[in-house]
Amino acid sequence: MNARVIRVVVVSGSLRAPSRTHGLLQALVERLPAVLPKLEVHWVRIAELSASLAGSLERDSASADLQPHLQAIEQADLLLVGSPVYRASYTGLFKHLFDLVDHQSLKGVPVVLAATGGSERHALMIDHQLRPLFAFFQAHTLPYGLYASVESFDDQRLADPAQFERIERVLDTVGAFFHIPVARAA
């Protein structure tokens, strides 16, 4: 079987680099080949694009360095998106990035939602903020989200075994979406 290459776009909504949000998404990306053996990964890091985003009020006037990232999002086969929790929501520039995305381009695209925060009390941000944002785009948000608090990290790297188990559940849903059987150790 000659499977097609899956275009994966990872959006890290943190305003800092390095960040725990990037660490969580990186842990997911590192395990993704277990279910998607042929993939292309494109990273969109808000921390690196903040000046371009802040200066782009409309899609037509978006800066030249921002355009390839917007096009990658609009052409993605799979989105992995994450943001730190700021005042019970995602970062403003994360939202602004998606304000510039064509509102019809994500219809039916699977999206893995992820967030990081100071404590577990912010975990509902995934369902109360991120999921409705992608519902607007008519994207297919996968049922398991990833939320990790400060205790799950060693510096900026994910270190909590329970989080790696959650990533495995997320990967199962990704594999199911693309009709790829997931082989697990007994």
Swiss-Prot record:
Cited InterPro entries: Flavoprotein-like_sf, FMN_Rdtase-like_dom, FMN_Rdtase_MsuE-like, NAD(P)H-dep_FMN_reductase
GO MF terms, alphabetically ordered: FMN reductase (NADPH) activity; oxidoreductase activity, acting on NAD(P)H, quinone or similar compound as acceptor
EC number(s) from the headed UniProt entry: 1.5.1.38
Catalytic class of the enzyme: oxidoreductase
One protein family per Pfam: FMN_red
Gene3D superfamilies per record: 3.40.50.360
Keywords: Flavoprotein, FMN, NADP, Oxidoreductase
Catalytic reaction annotation: FMNH2 + NADP(+) = FMN + NADPH + 2 H(+)
UniProt xrefs under PANTHER family: FMN REDUCTASE (NADPH) (PTHR43408:SF2)
Entry similarity comment: Belongs to the SsuE family.
Protein name: FMN reductase (NADPH)
Organism: Pseudomonas putida (strain ATCC 47054 / DSM 6125 / CFBP 8728 / NCIMB 11950 / KT2440)
Gene name, Swiss-Prot/TrEMBL: msuE
